[in-house]
């Protein structure tokens, strides 16, 4: 991912290939541009971008529920419509969460950058400093604990979490079947 002025860019791993979403903030709007290996992935890329920006929330309902709390009410009034950022890729989110344990944000960012540089998939067409996609669950599952600059047990946990199971992956994403995901978790 990269940030350049008012534009945030990040790679997307999609069903038919890779892509990059560029989100630009102006005074009144947020615009989005997609660069995709396959245009058939456009709808999925838009859905992931909506999740990233929390565009499907209901700000009025959230305001109504949170504004009754005396501590939250002044904050809600000061920043109405504020949204909680999401993440477009649950595998990447899981890996980044584990990488961030017991290290600083800068340290976690460095570990993630090294992982992408060593094991990420190069984009067909780099966009604004984004050159690689985050490694897939299958790629991470194929690594050894020593490939991570962290304690061996944490690296092994990452590999296990990304390892395939008979009916898919332990990693849940939008559209995952909950019962199958729960059944796939280790005891």
Please state what every model-predicted region is.
Residues 1-187:
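HhH-family (HhH-GPD) DNA N-glycosylase catalytic core used in base-excision repair
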